[in-house]
Amino acid sequence: MLISARRLRRCQFFQLLTSCFVLSLMALLVQEDNSLINHVKSYSYRYLINSYDFVNDSLSVPRDRPDGAPSYRYLINNRDKCQNEDVLLLLFVKTSPENRRRRNAIRKTWGNEDYIRSQYAANIKVVFALGIEADPVKSHQTQKDLVIENKRFNDLIQQDFKDTFHNLTLKLLLQFGWVNSYCPSAKFIMSADDDIFVHTPNLVSYLKSLPIETQDFWIGRVHRGSPPIRSKTSKYYVPYEMYPWSSYPDYTAGAAYVVSKDVAAKVYEASQTLNTSLYIDDVFMGICANKMGVVPQYHVYFAGEGKAPYHPCIYNKMITSHGHLDDLDYLWRQATDPNVKSLSAGVLGGAYCKLVNIMLLCKLSYVDTYPCSAAWS
């Protein structure tokens, strides 16, 4: 009896310990609702419904509704930027009024139109999309500075909405509206943040290799089955009232993506009949594209919000990398140095860079960059 009693107490102790562990785990999972569990739920939800038609129907509004596509006045507009030219790539850089130093750095590096024209026989156009200074104290002087800057470079496109995070969808509408009105012949359109590096030589070479009449083309870092962020402490917080569903349609990270001209036209058309109050611009882009039946394609060398490793073997393949402000000159020198390109030439060079890329991209602890599969491409 004594042994049985001890065994019983020991069994009860382990049951209690197990119960405490399970309860603690459940509490942790509840706290992490916007993380792993939410992603699992949203991804399952995405494949169960297999269609977002009901989202499109719910967010559709008549063109004359106030929550439909707004119309803002151009304060600065370079309407003759394309001039009916044969434009391979129209590159929009999303910028803020105060970021003049970033714009100047881009003009000298990856946004250098003359370099691409002379070295790659390709016509690209780079313009900066922005709103107005949100701080009323600074707005007057900032606007004067922007006018002076545009007189020198003729590459600013500005409308009279406040340039804030919650107006990013308005900046998206500015871009596709401007394409529709002033540069409809551009074969490809890119949207990029002003804190990324775009390897324009690699990008232009890739775009030139595509069929002439490429359609339904949309590439970038694709987010599939992503859930809305419900934490009010996040700047990406989206309330249920704005978007009540468990996952978004597939979309590309807003840091950088490229579309063909027909996709740009379709997105613009869809945006005219959708509720524009959703301020997460890349998600809104995904909803517009989904309404028109356009599906994003994953390109392994678009880093999205990630940052590429610093290595010549990476530079040979990279398209975009995020989080670059003070190193654009260095990256541009690497991008335009023929010795860097020749590093991966030949059988030995190719094998060397393959091995280096595997070592750089396939670390389990290094996830915020290109995927491991990029090393094999």
From Swiss-Prot:
It is a single-pass type II membrane protein. The chain crosses the membrane at residues 13-30. Signal peptide: none annotated. InterPro entries: Glyco_trans_31. Pathway: Protein modification; protein glycosylation. It catalyses: a beta-D-Gal-(1->4)-beta-D-Glc-(1<->1)-Cer(d18:1(4E)) + UDP-N-acetyl-alpha-D-glucosamine = a beta-D-GlcNAc-(1->3)-beta-D-Gal-(1->4)-beta-D-Glc-(1<->1)-Cer(d18:1(4E)) + UDP + H(+); a neolactoside nLc4Cer(d18:1(4E)) + UDP-N-acetyl-alpha-D-glucosamine = a neolactoside IV(3)-beta-GlcNAc-nLc4Cer(d18:1(4E)) + UDP + H(+). One of its GO terms (biological process) is lipid metabolic process. One of its GO terms (cellular component) is Golgi membrane. Residues 31-377 are lumenal. Residues 1-12 are cytoplasmic. Glycans are attached at residues 56, 167, 275. It comes from the Eukaryota. The keyword Glycosyltransferase applies. It is found in: Golgi apparatus membrane. The keyword Transferase applies. Its EC number is 2.4.1.206. Beta-1,3-N-acetylglucosaminyltransferase that plays a key role in the synthesis of lacto- or neolacto-series carbohydrate chains on glycolipids. Belongs to the glycosyltransferase 31 family. This is Lactosylceramide 1,3-N-acetyl-beta-D-glucosaminyltransferase. It comes from Xenopus tropicalis (Western clawed frog). The lineage of its organism: Eukaryota, Metazoa, Chordata, Craniata, Vertebrata.
